[in-house]
């Protein structure tokens, strides 16, 4: 899929290697917030069956999604309690950075520790199960058109849901991590802006790196999510059985629809 300037972390999951082939293009699209999409950008997306918005009510109110012709809109906020203060309570980048720096000044636990807790909490969230169930069923029921699922940056909430979808489709963890970490490439400009904002506010390299820890994708965070899944549910199939109402037939049909033998 062609890169869209207003939504740099929007990407088709097509082409990722899985157990019996590759993820089929035009089925699963992960993204950050869509509010900057223009009509010409929406036209590039092709047929969209549904949009799953995982943002909070406040995030949606400030930056509502644009209308995508023919797409069903489903709002399932995934908000683990620990992430609300430093992600959802502020709107502008300087405000978000200042909010995070409050934790730095108060000697709160390192960003890596806090984010591992956030990622583990998202896996155990009932809303994550609802979102995964919805995406799977939309693909199975609609059969044509892509499903877009997104949060604000397309990193944390979209990252966890993507990892679980790829686990279900049979991707190796190396492919799952590669997809997750691509966010740092897609959002390289935004990451530099966050670091610069922190330096401007406090003038401390250590503080700037602390802030950057909340904005970048880090493999240890995703590892916390996958470890939580494995320890509590033993497998993605166990997760689906306990946290969703997706049947075995629906899971297999989802795989059939989303996997092709060779990449386009």
Language model features by range: what are they?
Residues 1-148, 160-264:
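Cys-dependent protein tyrosine phosphatase-like superfamily
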Residues 153, 157-158:
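Ser/Thr-glycine-rich phosphate-binding loops at phosphate-binding pockets of nucleotides
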């Amino acid at each position: 899929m062609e890169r869209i300037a207003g939504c740099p972390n929007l990407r088709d999951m097509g082409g990722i290697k899985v157990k019996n082939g590759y993820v089929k293009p035009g089925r699963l699209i992960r993204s950050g917030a869509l509010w900057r999409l223009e009509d010409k950008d929406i036209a590039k997306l092709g047929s969209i069956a549904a949009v799953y918005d995982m943002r909070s009510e406040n995030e949606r109110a400030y930056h509502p999604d644009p209308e995508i012709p023919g797409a069903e809109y489903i709002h399932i906020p995934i908000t683990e309690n620990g992430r609300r203060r430093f992600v959802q309570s502020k709107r502008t980048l300087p405000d978000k950075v200042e909010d995070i720096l409050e934790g730095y000044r108060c000697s709160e636990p390192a960003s890596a520790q806090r984010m591992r807790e956030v990622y583990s909490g998202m896996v155990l969230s009932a809303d994550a199960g609802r979102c995964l169930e919805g995406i799977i069923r939309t693909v199975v029921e609609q059969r044509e058109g892509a499903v877009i699922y997104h949060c604000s940056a397309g990193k944390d909430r979209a990252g966890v849901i993507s990892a679980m979808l790829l686990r279900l489709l049979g991707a190796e963890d190396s492919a799952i991590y590669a997809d997750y970490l691509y966010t740092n490439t897609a959002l390289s400009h935004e990451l530099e802006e966050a670091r610069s904002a922190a330096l401007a506010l406090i003038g401390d390299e250590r503080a700037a790196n602390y802030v950057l820890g909340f904005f970048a994708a880090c493999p240890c965070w995703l590892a916390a999510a996958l470890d939580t899944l494995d320890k509590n549910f033993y497998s993605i199939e166990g997760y689906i059985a306990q946290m969703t109402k997706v049947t075995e037939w629906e899971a297999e049909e989802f795989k059939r629809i989303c996997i092709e033998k060779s990449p386009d």
